Every structure is written in C-alpha cells, then in structure tokens.
Amino acid sequence: MKTNLLDFNLDQLTQHFAEMGEKPFRAKQVMRWMHQMAEDDFDAMTDLAKSLRAKLHERAEVRVPSLMTGQASSDGTRKWLLDVGTGNGVETVFIPEDDRGTLCVSSQVGCALECTFCSTGRQGFNRNLSTAEIIGQLWWANKAMGVTPKNERVVSNVVMMGMGEPLANFDNVVSAMQIMLDDHGYGLSRRRVTLSTSGLVPQMDRLREECPVALAVSLHAPNDAIRDVIVPINKKYPLSELMAACRRYLEKAPRDFITFEYVMLDGVNDRPEHARQLLELVRDVPCKFNLIPFNPFPNSGYDRSSNNAIRIFREILQEQGYVVTVRKTRGDDIDAACGQLAGQVQDKTRRQAKWTQIIEDRKS
C-alpha cells in the first residue's frame, strides 16, 4: 500500500524522505507543492528530479478525501461533505467575512461526547480522522476556491470546531495543525488557528506544551449541575478543574485570553442569574464570551433563547467589562451553522438508535 504523504508534518516528511535516501530540502519542496499549490500529481512537481518523481509514484501518493456533495448558502457560506470511506462522510464549512475567511474543520467521524444540544453528538461516533483527512479539508477548500501562492489567501483562519472533539484525537489533530502553521505548509499564525474543546483537561495541558494555538472552550453552563446534563464530560472534568486548566493554558497561549463559547438554550442556561453565576465562575480567567443562539435541528428538545433574553444576558456580562460577541448565525439554510454539522456517520455506539427511541417515547 502506498504511503499518503498528507499524513506527515514537515519533521515526519523529512524523516520519510531520509529513509528513501533523499535530502531534507526535498521534503520542503514536496510540502510546498502539496499544501501551497494544492497539487496531488507528482509529475506536476517540476522542480523535483525525474528519478525522485518516479520513486514517489512507486511508493507514495497524495490522497485527500473525495467530494460527496457541496452546498452554497445564500450568505456565501460553503459546505462540503467529504468521503472518508466505509460509508462515512465529514463536513467542513467555509465562512467568508469582510476581513477574513474562516474554515471550520472536523476532527472525528461523529463525536463520542454526547453534548445534548449538538446534532453531531446525536449521530454517534465511528472513528478518529487521520492527519491526511483533517488537513485534507483545508487542502480541498483551497483547491475548490482556486488558491495558489500568487492569489490572495482565501482561508485566513482555521477553527477546529467541526464534527468531533479535537483533543480526543490529539496526535492527528496536532500534526495537522503543525502543517497549518508551517511556513512550507499553510503559514498560518498561532493566533489564526483556534481549537475548541469541551474540556478534556489532561489534553489541554499537553496542547499547551506541544502546540499552543488559540483556545476556545465549549462552556455552555455556569455551574456543574447544568453542565453535567448538557455537556456530560463535565462529570469527569468538573468546572473547577476546567478553569484551572484554562489558567495554566494561558501561560503559553498565543492570545492572552480564553474564548468561552456559550450556546443559549431557552429556559436552561439563559437567565440573568445564570449570567451572574458565569461571572463568578470565570473571575480569575482572562476571557471573552461568544454567545451562540441555539440552531434548532429535528427533535432536539431545545428552543433558541429569545433575542431579549440574549440581550439581557450579554449586557450583564458587558457591564463587568467583558468583551461579548453574539455569533451571527451563518449557513443555517444548508445546516452549516454551529451545532448542525452531522455528516454521514456509521455509528458504532448505537447512539442514533438510543435517540430514536427517546424521541419515540416523547411522542407516545
């Protein structure tokens, strides 16, 4: 079986080329061709020796996930469903804005964490994505939008906020992010790559040491009682441990704050007393807040908070000097908004069946 070179960051690719008897600069050349030119044909890599190209044809390949479907939203958001084999597909979303273009990247086929308000979590879990399948989403987006080094960069920011919990696939996610950051890869700054986690505390500490990028934490609740229900990983890593991990992370983070993401669920976590509890929770953690209006999906069991409830919640936080943004819902007409990514998951956890039974019980 041929080796997929997209699975390697620069250090790994250099080692692979050394084992082939090639010099380190060859790895950098191939890295630039693969990632900066979105090239998957070795014959097109014209500054490589013919003998090396022949060797690569024999032993290696540049294999990205193939496109299953693509959709464009009325607001310019684009969503691609990419085939990762055995009946599974993952979704990646490009969100254009005036001053940036953000790509939302998936890290797993489904998700094992079972956050109750998230469509991805309802789909169950199949497996982790490989490095090639993760970085292949950025590769595919650049290819689809005709990007080369001569063009203005279209994807200026990457957020690891698609399907899956990134820190549950630590090694492959970090390797992919290293390619994003590498000057021979995509050359993004650490401030422009954001990883979002539900709060896997040991892996947060590893990330701080190995690849400290901007960090967002899917908080969604001001106390353990609520978070235990809607973000069940909280039972393993409660809020006191999570806040301590956030403080440690800031020692090496590229930004001097954590972004706390908070989905607004009507009657669940959106009352003024919840906002005041939230202020008490984060008092020792430099942070900003991103309030996310809930994006409904069939049989979710939740409703979106009213605009008035969101406004009051936001103002309570702002009065204490915090920066608070309310996420603009983008791509909801193509199910590309936050919490709506479901992909195509051959569930190994039987969670789809469990939720189907719960929904049927509600109806009866």
From Swiss-Prot:
Pfam families: Radical_SAM (PF04055), RlmN_N (PF21016). One of its GO terms (molecular function) is rRNA (adenine(2503)-C2-)-methyltransferase activity. The keyword rRNA processing applies. S-adenosyl-L-methionine binds at G164, E165, S196, S218, L219, H220, N295. [4Fe-4S] cluster binds at C111, C115, C118. Its EC number is 2.1.1.192. SUPFAM superfamilies: Radical SAM enzymes (SSF102114). It catalyses: adenosine(2503) in 23S rRNA + 2 reduced [2Fe-2S]-[ferredoxin] + 2 S-adenosyl-L-methionine = 2-methyladenosine(2503) in 23S rRNA + 5'-deoxyadenosine + L-methionine + 2 oxidized [2Fe-2S]-[ferredoxin] + S-adenosyl-L-homocysteine; adenosine(37) in tRNA + 2 reduced [2Fe-2S]-[ferredoxin] + 2 S-adenosyl-L-methionine = 2-methyladenosine(37) in tRNA + 5'-deoxyadenosine + L-methionine + 2 oxidized [2Fe-2S]-[ferredoxin] + S-adenosyl-L-homocysteine. GO terms for cellular component: cytoplasm. The active site is at E91 (proton acceptor), C338 (s-methylcysteine intermediate). Disulfide bonds join C104-C338. Keywords: 4Fe-4S, Cytoplasm, Disulfide bond, Iron, Iron-sulfur, Metal-binding, Methyltransferase, rRNA processing, S-adenosyl-L-methionine, Transferase, tRNA processing. It comes from the Bacteria. The keyword Electron transport does not apply. GO terms for biological process: rRNA base methylation; tRNA methylation. It is an enzyme of class 2 (transferase). It is found in: Cytoplasm. Its cofactor is [4Fe-4S] cluster. Specifically methylates position 2 of adenine 2503 in 23S rRNA and position 2 of adenine 37 in tRNAs. m2A2503 modification seems to play a crucial role in the proofreading step occurring at the peptidyl transferase center and thus would serve to optimize ribosomal fidelity. Belongs to the radical SAM superfamily. RlmN family. PANTHER family: 23S RRNA METHYLTRANSFERASE (PTHR30544), RADICAL SAM CORE DOMAIN-CONTAINING PROTEIN (PTHR30544:SF5). NCBIfam families: rRNA_mod_RlmN (TIGR00048). This is Dual-specificity RNA methyltransferase RlmN. It comes from Chromobacterium violaceum (strain ATCC 12472 / DSM 30191 / JCM 1249 / CCUG 213 / NBRC 12614 / NCIMB 9131 / NCTC 9757 / MK). The lineage of its organism: Bacteria, Pseudomonadati, Pseudomonadota, Betaproteobacteria, Neisseriales.
